[in-house]
Amino acid sequence: MNQSSLLAEFGDPITRVENALIALKEGRGVLLLDDEDRENEGDIIYSVEHLTNEQMALMIRECSGIVCLCLTDAQADKLELPPMVVNNNSANQTAFTVSIEAKVGVTTGVSAADRVTTIKTAANPHAKPEDLARPGHVFPLRARPGGVMTRRGHTEGTIDLMQMAGLQPAGVLCEVTNPDGTMAKAPEIVAFGHLHNMPVLTIEDMVAYRNQFDLKLA
């Protein structure tokens, strides 16, 4: 069964995006699937603005545990975050920067509370490069300008969703995994959404939404 059939219970593409925006404004998470011919995987996404220790613990416990902070190009530049590697030859050109840790307010940096502190420190509009230690336990991702219209990735989808919801343009994501450690695909993502009261949408939905409403995002 393809994504469209599986997600029909969540409404049409526009409704799915609108429900995701409502959830984010309420401080809840959403589940974002990328294209079936790409990774065909789902990420749990939370806004940095509303992020709680409990939500971070859920990502560590129920997902891959590799929690990434999606930042705009401008914020990553402001923090002077260089690429993780000089030559990025990953299949999807995921723009990891060096990993980070808050210099103040954390212990080992690995606990849910410490990761939330690091994330909120880095996403603060007034943050400075010297507020962060490198390396650390949080993995920033640099979103391409233009969002999903430029690159159909979870990073860009996260930043677009925050902007569309009127929230601070920073979000966290973590890939959802199955209990046996394999990657969750669309059927498992739908089940996860029901279990945790999270709407499900796709990158394709977001592209359709932006095209329909002619949304120009940074």
Swiss-Prot record:
Superkingdom of this protein's organism: Bacteria
Source species: Vibrio parahaemolyticus serotype O3:K6 (strain RIMD 2210633)
Entry-linked SUPFAM superfamilies: YrdC/RibB (SSF55821)
Coiled-coil stretches: none
Gene3D superfamilies: DHBP synthase (3.90.870.10)
Residues of the site described as Essential for catalytic activity: 137, 175
EC number: 4.1.99.12
Positions contributing to Mg(2+) 1 binding: 39
Similarity-based family: Belongs to the DHBP synthase family.
Taxonomic lineage: Bacteria, Pseudomonadati, Pseudomonadota, Gammaproteobacteria, Vibrionales
HAMAP family given in the database record: RibB (MF_00180)
Described purpose of this protein according to its UniProt entry: Catalyzes the conversion of D-ribulose 5-phosphate to formate and 3,4-dihydroxy-2-butanone 4-phosphate.
Pathway annotation from the record: Cofactor biosynthesis; riboflavin biosynthesis; 2-hydroxy-3-oxobutyl phosphate from D-ribulose 5-phosphate: step 1/1
Residue positions binding Mg(2+) 2: 39, 154
MF terms in GO: 3,4-dihydroxy-2-butanone-4-phosphate synthase activity; magnesium ion binding; manganese ion binding
Protein name: 3,4-dihydroxy-2-butanone 4-phosphate synthase
Entry-linked InterPro entries: DHBP_synth_RibB-like_a/b_dom (IPR017945), DHBP_synthase_RibB (IPR000422)
Pfam family, any one: DHBP_synthase
Oligomer status and interactors: Homodimer.
Residues annotated to bind D-ribulose 5-phosphate: 38-39, 43, 151-155, 175
Keywords: Lyase, Magnesium, Manganese, Metal-binding, Riboflavin biosynthesis
BP term (GO), one: riboflavin biosynthetic process
Cofactor binding summary note: Binds 2 divalent metal cations per subunit. Magnesium or manganese.
